[in-house]
Amino acid sequence: MLPATFKLCAGISYRHTRNMTGLRKNAMVAIHHELNMLAGPNPSSWISHVRRRSSLLSSRIEEEQGYNEAEVSYVKQGEEALQKSISILGDQDGWTTEIIAANGDKVLSKVLPDVGKVFKLEVLLDQRSDNLYGELVGNMEQMGDWNPNVKEVKILQKIGQETMVTHEVSGPTPGNVVGPRDFVSVRCAKRRGSTCFLAGMSTQHPTMPEQRGVVRAENGPTCIVMRPSADDPNKTKFTWLLSIDLKGWIPKTIINKVLSQTQVDFANHLRQRMADNSVSKEMAPAC
């Protein structure tokens, strides 16, 4: 989206495999190794939650038995995006404050080797996490209706219940500082217990080559994490990790300002969307 929604490095090559047993073994070894690395002496509460639920990052391998080579690759890419995102979010050191809004919304950033500059939005939303998940995942293609930073989101392909490939076109920026961008992304959506995840990274898809007049940008890993507030389960602690390469000759100072402000704007647009949804439900006639 630009914001929300999530995109990451296109043109990444992945080794395809037809051996599902090998895929299961390799994926689980890598995932558990990563989670062990995340476990420092004082792991954050949500990482501890992830470790307790070992099924968080594991795909339902039995659902993949009928997948072809390309579908298996997309599932694997989505899992990798989630794994990398959790690793980044689990490291609390080295973050620099970019924005602190009057309502407490905060954007932080840090520079990572082989990834570049990443941004992290941290907000508290007056919505239950399952409602937010339903809007961002279940109504994903409607995002352009309420987020002016997004012109269109289209699901190109679904693989099982947790993986999809999407095409997103960004909306105009003030003063057209950044021209039209689009993204092709693989997304991994998971709900485990009370915690919801939406991770993604750039990929390629045969039905969506680069479009004339639009710069194909890259993103990833990106991830939204939604979990109930410890103080009030009707509120959600919302974290959004954003990593984007907009391509083109754009000064870094402008990119940093655009991306951090995009995250703050997204939080406000999402609040308004959820408020509008609540009003619509209240006004709906009883059956």
UniProtKB/Swiss-Prot annotation:
Ranges for domain START: 66-279
Transit peptide range per the UniProt entry: 1-61
SMART domains membership: START
Ranges in coiled-coil conformation: none
Pathway: Steroid metabolism; cholesterol metabolism
GO molecular function (one): cholesterol binding
Name by which UniProt lists this protein: Steroidogenic acute regulatory protein, mitochondrial
Gene field: star
